[in-house]
Amino acid sequence: MRPNDRKADQVRPIKITRNYTAYAEGSVLVEFGNTKVLCNATVEESVPRWLKGQGRGWVTAEYGMLPRATHSRTRREAANGKQGGRTMEIQRLIARSLRAVVDLQAMGEFMITVDCDVIQADGGTRTASISGASVAMADAFQHLVDSGKLKANPMKGHVAAVSVGLLGDEVLCDLEYVEDSAADTDMNVVMTEEGKMIEIQGTAEGEPFSHEQLMALLESAKVGITEIVAAQKAALAN
């Protein structure tokens, strides 16, 4: 039996709070059960040097964990003088996922940076970051539209992500930490709201998984992402 008696393909309770901080053009606190991530989207009227003069924009992201986001304190990466490999991998994943649903040409020469800071971690921090960042980015773009700097929101749709895994032979969606740490296979799936794939990251930690199990994992992810996109749309409608 899963924690909180969840069904195998059921995501944790989702809460998306917009305008969470006062200064960012888009600010969202996203909660998936006990995992909580603050996603702040900042608009800059500039682009990286290699994009200047091309008339197109850019979306990037940064990711980090507060020291006591986990059960024991984790030393700040700034104190070590550099970011860890896991952090760099995750923030690149977030940025790629966001750019996949943006018409960069329609942005003009603006750049949006989404900072994803994990306040509390209970599994699925990277997938929660992507799902929350999508809403924060939508608000940042709407800020540009409302201020007359863009004619229309250049987002082509929503992007959302979820973790799925195999615990024994059972396919589970949106793994909590206790499930993730025991899973034979752990996979992160990123999709558009239409169900098109953006990224699949999957590893067999224990027994290798079959093609049939892979398809079952992806189907479970699609069910979960459909639910997440509905929560994103509901949050933006309020």
Curated annotation (Swiss-Prot):
- Protein purpose: Phosphorolytic 3'-5' exoribonuclease that plays an important role in tRNA 3'-end maturation. Removes nucleotide residues following the 3'-CCA terminus of tRNAs; can also add nucleotides to the ends of RNA molecules by using nucleoside diphosphates as substrates, but this may not be physiologically important. Probably plays a role in initiation of 16S rRNA degradation (leading to ribosome degradation) during starvation.
- Tell me its family: Belongs to the RNase PH family.
For the biological process aspect of GO, one term held by this record is: rRNA catabolic process
CDD domains documented for this protein: RNase_PH_bact (cd11362)
Molecular function in Gene Ontology: 3'-5'-RNA exonuclease activity; tRNA binding; tRNA nucleotidyltransferase activity
Q: Which residues bind phosphate?
A: R86, G124, T125, R126
Q: What is the protein named?
A: Ribonuclease PH
Domain of life, per UniProt, equals: Bacteria
Keywords from the UniProt entry? Nucleotidyltransferase, RNA-binding, rRNA processing, Transferase, tRNA processing, tRNA-binding
Q: Which catalysed reactions does the entry list for this protein? A: tRNA(n+1) + phosphate = tRNA(n) + a ribonucleoside 5'-diphosphate
Which EC number(s) are documented for this chain? 2.7.7.56
Residues spanning the membrane? none
Q: How does it assemble?
A: Homohexameric ring arranged as a trimer of dimers.
> What would be one Pfam family of this protein?
RNase_PH_C
